[in-house]
Amino acid sequence: MQDIEPFYNWRHIYISEEDQRSPFFGRTYSEFEFSQTVYNYYIHPQWDDFGSRTLYLKTLLADYDEKYAVIELIGEWNDAIENDIMELKREVLEKFMYEGITKFILIAENVLNFHSSNSDYYEELYDELSDEGGWVVCLNMPSQTQYDFKKAHLNRYIELMELDNWRTYKPFHLFKKIDGELTARLH
């Protein structure tokens, strides 16, 4: 896991630690000192800690004009013990929502497990974003993780989508593709 870096090909467009509106503004990173772990496995030092002991993230892009953010996740999403959705909502998503972001693309291909609890925070997040015309999409969640996510019926609140070649898109084009697909599903 220490070799899995956050996607960095958009860093010429956006760097979360340099964005004064980002929850991660001012953070500094080491390229050589591995200190964060998911269980006993070290992860690359570029990932951001947001309060969970098993799930980390990197904000790849926040576009305040178009009102969307792309966030990559790594680790285990554990609502049963860690209440990760509460931490993610309170410590990251709400801070972006306060800045006007209403649409979130969560890249979940490195979320290896999911353990559910109740759906309260998912429902709350869905309601808050829907009121503003927003949404949350989990992109490329592994099938075993999707199984547990769907079993808890959380896909009512967070859309699950597949787009294997998302890295080939520019951020705005990725957003427009996903936004267009969601709009088409609703009509």
Specify the residue positions occupied by each region the protein language model found:
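Amphipathic, Lys/Arg-enriched alpha-helical "gate/interface" segment within cytosolic domains
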Residues: 2-50, 60-64, 69-73, 77-110, ...
